[in-house]
């Protein structure tokens, strides 16, 4: 596995010379004008006339997909508690396009609350943003200027990873016949604390800048027909979760470990860490050619002081290109339509349009045609469904609205939201939604906003304390067992035949045996069918709902026709709604009076019902449950540590006492990262998962080291005491002996003296 470091030398010069100056040019009032495209599809197409230095530029824009309905922003308060909310308000804001009459021009703009973004012409870039303190849709125009500099990428270090083993294709291999088609990749973006502070320490402002960066990334990737969808933005607004100092490769390896524990990854997703460095020697690090390896799909992009958003975007595009398997261009053989090619060092500090070279395009075509990008989606998942127009007063929060409390007469939060403009009133935190109180404040975190409707298959959702709406519905992943293994969870309900029959005709009616289904659903009429025709035997449990009836009196539910069949001592019943309209003329040959397999009502078996061992019904067909569940993304025994179950987002929903995302033990924790329930985050998941065992091992180590030392010390003290007693006893005996000897000598002398 190669680790690629994008090395930028001479950054002392960059600090002084490469700092791009925003040269203010003028103020202007963009004018929205009509066009044939805008008239045909005004929701997706718009045209503005923007005058710069007396010259009108006609900017044609098309709606750009950057966010999905599942995109979230995560941030941390001063207590390091994480707060999450969807990015729904930003979904309809992003556009890209071109300037009419200027070949190869590129424009990337956000159109909510004014125009904000970049216009890239041949060799010059203009920025535009609203003057928020001034009324009247006045905007300021500035030019991005880069001073000449001799800063280059250090070739030996930068290209050290690129050898014969990693060669994308042979130069003789032609790719002219290969056609590209749209692909999508989801990106988790993490912003470190230093960059958060550098960008103004404001959650909304930093979020807007990140979205602006990815919008420009997508504009530059248009040649490759590749679109980046923001899966989540996590801003470390309180403190960094890993160390972001030191060499970029070490930061990448730390981020690599962090993402394994904290991000729920899918094969088509990638994680990027945005880091601020005042004067770095490296601008990034990544694993080349590993975009489809979810274990290594990550990169670190460093943001030097003074760098423009456009230049930083180029760094990210280059890193992403390396992730995809592209290489830096050899300037003597690789050429592009513009003055600067994207995969060259010069692109970082050049204004205007940057194109991918012929070499990069050929490499990308080759990789995509040789199954190198099979993980990338060919259709965007959960992309926004656009309506023909936004409607203020329909009670739905749509793009550009700050609130929507309903119409003027039925507004749910009259003190908080202007029902005519869908704007918040003064001092209001919120103006609509289940998590917005009547006094215009967010309801406290962990307030229930949507109760579970099925004890086995549905989960309760909570307000997160920072968003006015209840989060998306969460429930047990389709295909998980319920009813003691006799049924499957599907769309948040336990799909048992008994409950379906009781709901339809009541009085304890139960699901019928298979021979009742065989008798009725092979008829091919309005009481027994699989849509437009009779059911084949393998699908008979997936057509009309057949129940048993144990009462002597007839079923008397209004507007319900009933057929009775006596089979093997069982009274089998099937029903039909006579209020149904007859089929169109083209379908009169059908005896069932149903138009298609999708033309169903409550008299049919529900999708998700059991139709055999590990088999479930879907659109009147019996299918194997393995096609319903993605065990590669979420396997409860592994991802959830055996203390949770996978939800409809393929994330773990943890038991009480276990903390998401991987269900590690933690007091009072439960739920998932999707249901809004918050747990104080003083101790991170890594601290619980790694430091706790380490602490235990440390105490064990201290104990096992201390015990022998204590025993030895005690033994020494005891020995020393005995030795001291022995010495004392010896000294006493010695003194006594000397005394006796002295006395004896005295007596002897005295005797001798007397004798003389």
From Swiss-Prot:
It comes from the Eukaryota. PROSITE patterns: ADAM_MEPRO, DISINTEGRIN_1, DISINTEGRIN_2, EGF_2, EGF_3. It is found in: Membrane. Disulfide bonds join 292-375, 334-359, 336-341, 449-470, 634-646, 640-652, 654-663. The keyword Signal applies. Residues 731-756 are annotated as: Disordered. The chain crosses the membrane at residues 699-719. GO terms for cellular component: plasma membrane. One of its GO terms (biological process) is binding of sperm to zona pellucida. Residues 389-478 form the Disintegrin domain. InterPro entries: ADAM_Cys-rich, Disintegrin_CS, Disintegrin_dom, Disintegrin_dom_sf, EGF-like_dom, EGF_extracell, MetalloPept_cat_dom_sf, Peptidase_M12B. Residues 735-756 have a biased composition (Low complexity). Its main location: membrane. Residues 720-756 are cytoplasmic. Glycans are attached at residue 559. Detected in testis (at protein level). Detected in adult and prepubertal testis. Detected at very low levels in heart, kidney, brain, muscle ovary and uterus. Gene3D superfamilies: Collagenase (Catalytic Domain), Disintegrin domain. Residues 17-698 are extracellular. Subject to proteolytic processing during epididymal transit of spermatozoa. It is a single-pass type I membrane protein. Interacts with TEX101. This is Disintegrin and metalloproteinase domain-containing protein 5.
